[in-house]
Curated annotation (Swiss-Prot):
Source organism of this protein record: Ehrlichia canis (strain Jake)
Protein name: ATP synthase subunit alpha
Membrane topology annotation: Peripheral membrane protein
Subunit structure: F-type ATPases have 2 components, CF(1) - the catalytic core - and CF(0) - the membrane proton channel. CF(1) has five subunits: alpha(3), beta(3), gamma(1), delta(1), epsilon(1). CF(0) has three main subunits: a(1), b(2) and c(9-12). The alpha and beta chains form an alternating ring which encloses part of the gamma chain. CF(1) is attached to CF(0) by a central stalk formed by the gamma and epsilon chains, while a peripheral stalk is formed by the delta and b chains.
The keyword Heme belongs to this UniProt entry's keyword annotation: no
Gene (name only): atpA
Site positions (Required for activity): 372
EC number: 7.1.2.2
Location within or outside the cell: Cell inner membrane
Pfam family name, one: ATP-synt_ab
């Protein structure tokens, strides 16, 4: 038996192997960390690095390239900077920063990278989206036409917000800015419980630079009220690095865009963009960028405009989804003419202005109706709201003017006294306790009681009690009237509502 292998056979096998050899050479752009300070790593050798590219260090910590020089790249670290040292290698990934998105994140508390921090296990999301993408163009949008109810009388009646709008909440510290945003999120439960999955409003709350105790309190309130099940909380607290505080709103916006681009509706609250601008200023100064006004870098306007422009009401061809933004700005001593407040005011579609003076007088929410405005929301109001609330803002303006005049102690004619009396009752009607949102029909019924003059004979101190009794009467004995108010506020419904109001007011005489 001949076991020898012929040379020809060997040659054939070698030729076959050479022909089938798949030489896949992958060239990586690798650099070396030459210095690290305050969360910024200076890396030498990343010649092919691109601005915004994700870089991975030796120990698996990631970073983003936010500065490019001749020989070095400045990389902002996302993670424990102490685990990155001089001499470590840094490798370009060729990717942009992305985060997990989808329904799996609902009810969870995550950090700026989408990692869960609530101790409830991993987030099993299969979809990831880049944190920074271009805002929808002109053709991809349509005008704001659907209302987004906050459940707060003074806002829904006088400063209405529509789906796809950017409405700024601005005011000094401790004036109730976060309270309005949280009430709006809680109010969506009234809406979500009665509509299909496609029509639900999903919510995202972004905490930037806040105390962890305050974030925990908000999460607990959302959980107790049943709102956490349709809400994502993205937290970058005061103890987190500036890189996380900078990235958090963009990451949250990407999560919201998942709902918007799939024909659904999402509400996102940025709390707050003042701290976001401060974090970006700190990061920019560490990156050796030249400072401008108030030491902010020159592109601080673009920082917020590219974020807020991603909120939109999409066209029917794009699924008709929406992303509504409620950015929050904290002012110092009521100064709305500072750099960041004026920037965000010019970007947004209106502002809800909260004043300390009004707050300390006991008027909550402390909204200054005269300075607050909604530039596009009125187009989204339902007919019953337009009928009832159309004249309220004008009558309140007349009331404030006469109130200033009356302080001088001059004699007031009968008409002016009537305007003052009705104005005081109207202001009392617009007061509302925190965490007690009202449906649109309930708001219309309450405001109608004030505008129709039915409360003129009730003392101002009893207006709050009257409101409680009216809402109780409507919900217990006349639920069909409330549904008719929402659908079509006809003269018949109006007459029936007047009878109910008269019945309630009679108990105060």
């Amino acid at each position: 038996m001949n076991n020898t292998i012929s040379p020809g056979e060997v040659l054939r096998v070698i030729k076959e192997r050479i022909e089938n050899f798949d030489n896949q050479v992958k060239a990586d752009s690798v650099g070396e960390v030459i210095s690290i300070k305050d969360g910024i790593a200076i890396v030498y050798g990343l010649e092919k690095a691109k601005f915004g590219e994700v870089v991975v260090f030796t120990n698996g910590v990631t970073g983003i390239v936010l500065g490019l020089d001749c020989d070095t790249a400045s990389v902002v670290i996302f993670g424990n900077e102490r685990s990155v040292g001089e001499g470590d290698t840094a490798k370009c990934t060729g990717k942009l920063m992305d985060v997990p998105v989808g329904f799996e994140l609902l009810g969870r508390v995550v950090d700026a990278l989408g990692n869960p921090i609530d101790g409830a296990g991993n987030v099993d999301s299969k979809i990831r989206l880049p944190v920074e993408i271009k805002a929808p163009g002109i053709i991809a949008r349509q005008s704001v036409s659907e209302p987004l109810q906050t459940g707060i009388k003074v806002i829904d009646m006088l400063i209405p917000i529509g789906r796809g709008q950017r409405e700024l909440i601005i005011g000094d510290r401790k004036t109730g800015k976060t309270a309005i945003a949280i009430d709006t999120i809680i109010n969506q439960k009234l809406h979500n419980d009665t509509v299909s999955e496609k029509e639900k409003v999903y919510c995202i709350y972004v905490a930037i630079g806040q105390k962890n105790s305050a974030i925990a309190r908000i999460v607990d309130k959302l959980r107790v009220s049943g709102a956490l099940e349709y809400t994502i909380v993205v937290a970058a607290g005061a103890s987190d690095t500036v890189s996380f505080q900078y990235l958090a709103p963009y990451a949250a916006c990407a999560m919201g865009e998942f709902f918007r681009d799939n024909g659904m509706h999402c509400l996102i609250v940025y709390d707050d963009l003042s701290k976001h601008a401060v974090a970006y200023r700190q990061m920019s100064l560490l990156l050796r960028r030249p400072p401008g006004r108030e030491a902010y870098p020159g592109d601080v306007f673009f920082l917020h405009s590219r974020l807020l422009e991603r909120a939109a009401k999409m066209s029917d061809e794009k699924g008709a989804g929406s992303l509504t933004a409620l950015p929050i700005i904290e002012t110092q001593a009521g100064d709305v003419s500072a750099y960041v407040p004026t920037n965000v005011i010019s970007i947004t579609d209106g502002q809800i202005f909260l004043e300390s003076e009004i707050f300390y007088k006991g008027f909550r929410p402390a909204v200054n109706v005269g300075l607050s405005v909604s530039r596009v929301g009125s187009a989204a109001q339902i007919k019953s709201v337009k009928k009832v609330a159309g004249s309220v803002k004008l009558s309140l303006a007349q009331y404030r003017e006469l109130e200033d005049f009356a302080k001088f102690g001059s004699d007031i004619d009968v008409h002016s006294k009537k305007v003052l009396d009705r104005g005081r009752r109207m202001m009392e009607l617009l007061k509302q306790k925190q965490y007690s949102p009202l449906s649109v029909a309930e708001q219309v019924a309450v405001i109608f009681a004030g505008t129709s003059g039915c409360l003129d004979d009730i003392s101002v101190n009893n207006v709050g009690k009257f409101e409680e009794m009216l809402l109780k009467e409507l919900n217990e004995n006349y639920p069909d009237v409330l549904s008719n108010i929402s659908n079509n506020f006809t003269d018949d419904v109006k007459d029936l509502l007047l009878d109910i109001i008269s019945k309630v007011t009679s108990s105060f005489k």
